[in-house]
Amino acid sequence: MVRPLATSVLALTLGAGSALADVTPAQVWQNLQDYSADYGYQVTGTIEDAGNTLTVTDAVFTMAGETDNSSVTFPKMTFQETGDARVRVVVEGDVALNSRFTVPAPTEDLAEDAPEAGAEAPAEPAPAETVDMTMTGTIKVPGNEMVVSGTPEDMLYEYSYPTLAFDFTLPTEPGQDATIPVTGTVTGLAGSQRNVASDGGMTSSFDLKAAQAAMQIVAQMPAEDADAGGGTLDFQLALTNLASQGTGKTPGQAFDLGSQMAQALAAGMTLDTTVTYDTLEGSFDVAGRDENGQDQTGTGSFATGASDIAFQMSGGGLGYKATTADAKAEMTISTLPFPISYALDQISGEMLIPVTKGDAAQPFKLAYALEGLTFADAIWKLFDPTSQLPRDPASLIVDLSGDAVVTQDLFDPAMGQPQTDADGMPVSESPFLPETLTVNRIALDAVGAKADITGALEFGDNPNEPVGTLNGTFEGVNGLMDKLVAMGLVPQEQMMGMRMMMAMFAKPAEGNPDQLTSEIEFREGGQIFANGQQVK
């Protein structure tokens, strides 16, 4: 629900077709309604059409699903001809947002309602109890202007918002009345969106930029119990040179995206979006008491350099890819005797998840990488005060891909409604049946040791008995073990056992005794061989 709601606010207060011919205020208003309907919104409002000026008061865009309901309300929207074949659109008053959604009830409530010991178990798991949560907010856009040109089938919306300010009230946790305020501003927001009618649906593209964006949370946090006594939170976040581009396509029929997302994707709905920014800076300051009534405090800051985020959604799956450079964080917590500080040259991640149920296997991908990870000396001195371990920047790479059968649409509303077992505890079942897994690379380089693993596995009827091979090379492991013993972190007798275990799975490389190699073979029937020797 968050994505359609956010898209609606942008599209409705921002906007999208090419400047080719006249458009009228009524046609622009109709285009906005059509665009919203394609994303599952119902539109109501009081219309006054004076020909060259159309006024809509109390325009409400509502998306009602089986378990949630969201609305965006515009007090007044004025559509006025400019005299040069275009229409000027202005939003007057504060835009109001309201979103109600259903979440699982707290586990304490589930335990209270669980059947007593010895009671007859139900024939089928009962649906878990749920509670409603509500988010409200307002958006202010003083000095806003949007100019629309083109034709009824191809409209271009060009907008400018000197300042966009938001003020939201968010629930803290299920079953609680406490809320926290979230405020923020976006300055220098400008861009365009184009809506083109196609095949009964609509193809949209957008491009926007903002000089700065900031968000703040300053709140009194509710107490978890009588002893804890609550606390305070001050969270600040700021970004510079924010930009976003993207395209989207809706099919020629309306869907309730809250409960019919799977059907919409199957019908051809797509979304492809990128977000970039130059810098991100943030800080936090928290204070409160723990369960023993002792005061606790924590302060910290974090920052990153240039970041690039991409998101894609279609019937082929959900795709996500992100890269962030020059990340760093520092924090001081009262329960720790030292500050925590670390930095990263780059962090990246990539994910592709199939979402549509089908008999044929579909591709997936999971990748994650940390490059140039360093820690402050205060952390190193805890376990290596004499600097015996190399403190060179560490790195980690995890790159997996494969194919899996999807047994249930991931956007099926039933996926979001947890089931419980006979004891009233939540139960879950994976919607994925893996067929292949390729370990493109798993690599670790830290404290003078390196590990690099590749391989491929295939899965049959029993996913716990794969067939395939994993190959690994390891460097500096023996030297690291020696240093851990010398530092007193691992007793000599325990290290002997670890060396014996390692000898079962790895052997020295020819001509390089400090390099180890390993070939782990998984065979039919669950047998496992390490370097030709059966270990299971």
Regions found by a protein language model. Name each.
Residues 1-21:
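Gram-negative bacterial Sec-dependent N-terminal signal peptides
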Residues 22-536:
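Glycine-rich, small/hydroxylated-residue low-complexity segments
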